[in-house]
Amino acid sequence: KLCLAGATAVALNAAPVAVFAKDEPLKVAFVYVSPANEEGWSSQHDIARKFVEEKFGDKIKVTWIENIPENADAQRVIRDLAQQGNKIIFATSFGYMNSVMKVAKQFPNVYFEHATGYKTSKNVKNYTARFYEGRYLAGMLAAATTKTNILGYVAALPIPEVFQGINAYTLGARAVNPNIEVRVVWTSSWYDPGKEADATKALIGMKADVITHHTNSTAVASTCEEAKVPVISYNSAMHKAAPTMLLGGVVHR
């Protein structure tokens, strides 16, 4: 499990003393790329948000905004949050990286935490986790389950984090069965339930009989449930979406 709540609390605890200097609450903001109430990447961040609100109480005032695409809207929203007096902003999706870097230059006294990125500055830091460890184990589980030796993988965008997951999953699977083939279908979006469902159906059509994903909705899990195909979830456990076909999940908490 990735401990997002712990990472978020550490980021707040590590904030410069000057940020906490005033008597008024520290203003903190979270920006999500998908709905906060649907199991997935954003919902796990929202669990972290609730955790830090409980931990810090009236010492902080938290704002969160969901469904912000990775385009000019992200830069506008992040800038607005900085202008509103937020001193720490969590930009929780890879594609927010350039927007964060641009806004950070304009607000040197605001601290930005960017998920899974690689660009930094004096007031921009990154956070990530060893996702590949869970992926490797998930691959082993899938290889022990498949009968066709074909595994399906619904992937969002061709970025290092996603390739890392695919590679780890494949290595884990081939540690159990060297004849495993992993077939990947791309959705070109972190959150598009329709495309995720279509990608899942396409993989089933390719004879993939165990499927996993690196996307943000429950569509892969629910589609596998309908098709009676075993699924390994990502981000959240997704028991409700696939109550009978869920093999396990790489869960971020």
Predicted regions and their residues:
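Aromatic-residue hotspot detector
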Residues: 1-2, 112
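Generic alpha-helical secondary-structure signal
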Residues: 2-5, 77
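C-terminal segment of classical bacterial N-terminal signal peptides
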Residues: 3, 10-19
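Long alpha-helical scaffolds
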Residues: 7-9, 208
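A residue-level marker of the well-folded mature domains of exported/periplasmic proteins
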Residues: 20-253
